[in-house]
């Protein structure tokens, strides 16, 4: 069990509350310095009270060093997964990094992100010339998609999982693994559907030995 503590909020239009990092007190003006302190305290509090290290979303690659010592998992979201700096930064991390499929639902984009993260790179990070050795624990997260009409396209069904398994088989990737995000476009943002979706994913996993190896877990929202 990894508590999911997301301290940043990606906004589709750039407007609205952007999370604890930007605005630790919603009733006051944004304060990034106070936000950095607040997000560290949040993750440390979870560790102290539960004994469980937490997960966060890497929305801003240059900020992840503020939490480098307190996280055990990071996810790269649907709107960031095609960004090169996110992929390169993930290649230098020593914890598992999950790459979500983009909002279009395109699985090839997600897998290309995993390929990039698993390879070594040489790039500029926070003003420094850095080299990475690649992150063999980079993997995929299925979160569903949205078509051009704004309709949700779930990708947690048995056929979707088998399609991902087949695509993994065509790539030279280490440690093939997938997490199913049972909210977002997989549930149509109907949080009560998560229980049913988890049951279906577990059934598919138990039914097929290949999926039992590939599907490592589920991601839920409270």
Identify the residue ranges that each predicted region occupies:
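Redox- and metal-dependent alpha/beta enzyme cores, enriched for Fe-S-associated oxidoreductases
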Residues: 164-169, 173
């Amino acid at each position: 069990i990894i508590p999911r503590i997301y301290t940043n909020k990606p906004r589709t239009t750039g407007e609205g509350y952007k999370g604890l990092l930007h605005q630790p007190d919603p009733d006051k003006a944004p304060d990034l310095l106070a936000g950095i302190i607040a997000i560290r305290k949040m993750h440390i509090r979870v560790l102290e009270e539960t004994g469980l290290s937490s997960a966060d979303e890497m929305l801003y690659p240059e900020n992840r060093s503020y939490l480098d010592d307190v996280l055990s998992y990071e996810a790269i979201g649907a709107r960031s997964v095609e960004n090169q700096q996110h992929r390169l930064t993930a290649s230098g991390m020593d914890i598992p990094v999950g790459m979500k499929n983009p909002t279009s639902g395109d699985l090839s984009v997600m897998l290309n992100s995993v390929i990039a993260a698993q390879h070594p790179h040489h790039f500029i990070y926070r003003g420094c010339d850095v080299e990475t050795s690649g992150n063999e624990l980079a993997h995929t997260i299925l979160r569903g998609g949205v078509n051009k009409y704004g309709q949700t396209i779930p990708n947690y069904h048995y056929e979707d999982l088998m399609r991902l398994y087949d695509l993994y088989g065509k790539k030279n990737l280490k440690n093939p693994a997938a997490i199913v995000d049972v909210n977002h476009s997989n549930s149509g943002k109907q949080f009560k559907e998560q229980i049913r979706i988890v049951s279906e994913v577990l059934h598919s996993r138990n039914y097929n030995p290949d999926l039992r190896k590939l599907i490592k877990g589920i991601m839920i929202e409270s």
